[in-house]
Amino acid sequence: MDETRLDKIEIKELEVFANHGVYPEENVLGQKFVISATLFTRTRLAGLTDELSASINYGEVSHMITDLTRKHTYKLLESLAENLAEMLLCSLSGLEKITLKIEKPWAPVGLPLKTVSVEITRKWHTAYIAFGSNMGDKKMYIDNGIRGLAETKGCRIEAISDYLITEPYGVTDQDEFLNGVLKMRTLLTPGELLVRLHQLEQAANRERIIHWGPRTLDLDILFYDQEIIDMPDLHIPHIDLHTRDFVLVPMNQIAPYLRHPVLNQTISQLLDSLLNKSENTAK
């Protein structure tokens, strides 16, 4: 997503009386909160057609913010902000990103101040996940894993490649694999997404005994936006994806023109290079 092409709709200083705070008195007596929201979307179609349905209705958004703020009680402004952002991003079609500022002008600090506030920015991210299985009912394990991911709050599956039967990689003395790739939108951070994938693997009774060994379900993050991450337990883009045909073939099916942020080549180019290398090796 090219954020430079996004337009903005702003809601400034919406006042809501609610009961958030650490102190019990705040939860009982309540106080004023002032909420501002910047909605990042595309207004081009609405501008051309003059149709409200082609845009985001800021009146409805103001009521949604007011309703959640009034009906729920949180100790922290941070919690209120996170829940508001998630609710709006998951509910509003066309909302790609949001900045929320929540002010608490009557905060019980005991000192003269104008206000205290928390400001966050959250957005949809695009991730590509490789999936595979070579034990038991392979398709069932994969289908259940994808379903679990689709049912995760803040996750949407956008495309799934064909399931491919492939030869085992690394340790070759094992059953054939069923492999593929999916494209998703998510509000989860890379670390949170990794944790969720591990939970789904564990739900399929995945055991990590032999490196590259048999597994009921394997879920790996290939790409997360155009981010480059190198941590002990997480490498994005996946460090070996350009050497694996069982990743590049399904990736080429759903995202041939996606560009690798490190190698600066498209998936289609990486696949062509790998196939040419394999042909030359075979000669």
Where are these regions (language model features)?
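Hydrophobic C-terminal alpha-helix "anchor/cap" residues
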Residues: 84, 88-89, 149-150, 197
